[in-house]
């Protein structure tokens, strides 16, 4: 039996009991079969609030995997999910441009990063659930676009070589080779030559790779070892080098505790972990213990229902589900769970699914688990309670946000009249160039946007999406320096109001971001 102290879940940043803790709700999640956590994570991304390329492709991935699991386990296949999937495919098609590239949001330029990410999800989905006819044409167009981009890169590399300069494939070229190795299609002769050129360069890059690059290169080289037997040996060397950097802690599992990487459009901790797992499954499939230790860290990085971004959730699902179909319906005797000494009842279907999720109102101080099986198990405890929004302070990490609200007809800031317009000005300062940045301005409840239509606004260079309680701004590129974003609102009722925060963050690398404090707005007749 193992005991866990839960008291720290109810403390504030000063180490004292947080306000609202007495009215908390405690959720306990536990499974003898971590593969089921992947299935449980899928609904959270299967019906997204946003209609950008990543959210839509993640949803297509989630709904297709759900259908695949239902068929595998002879469960009911829901018609509603199939209709939702068809709609999401149609919406994603509208974000693909004539050249095959994908735009992040409608109206934006096509992006190599975005196209690579969408195509990678497509080939991984095909690897788990079989070739998908609904996305096949989109994938072909995306690969054509990426092939053209890569051909340009190869041409430039050869020019540099003629000048006796050292050249290496870019990270995007590495992703391209991965997509081709997963897809398996035969390319035109000139594109096959580009591929062979890049593979040869990649096999000789030993000192120039990041941990992620080595793990991804190991997978690519192993998949291409039929055309060159030496590639498999080199793949093994890369994987061995990667494993020398691993850190192991019993609770956390096996992971890579390297210094924070230079900025990239997405956080690479989870992709690195997934690539190492993928390389291990290909090159050392019998080393089950190491693979399970790597998967344990992936589970520990899970945030309540899902990982921190849809694309990381998709990555994690792939790492657990690829080749693990036989484990989906593996049964094991349930563990005995006690909260503050009281036995927690188990739902009837928990034995079948190997998964338990239960809630209990109020604070809790101790969780006890008596495990009855030898399988890897995983659990989590979440505490939810409300705190005054005024206690949330500002913060910044690479991106700074300042917000100013100016009533058009009042003399003093912070006061407004019913029926007048106010202007909210956001001043965003970036310490470097950032990709795919989302700004969310949670406004006071008395404000209604003058322009309530979503769309790309060329004047400020971003996609604007007004919602019921907040306005979202999406920049596919936020350059270094200061940026001004302005929105006008009508004041529609009197009273004293408190806004929410305004946040700016890299959507797929959320450790880079900033947040403002809240503001008060007094509205007179």
Named regions from a protein language model:
Residues 1-20, 160-166, 171-525:
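Long, domain-scale non-catalytic interaction/scaffolding regions in large secretory-pathway
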Residues 1-167, 173-184, 188-189, 264-265, ...:
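Extended, solvent-exposed functional surface patches
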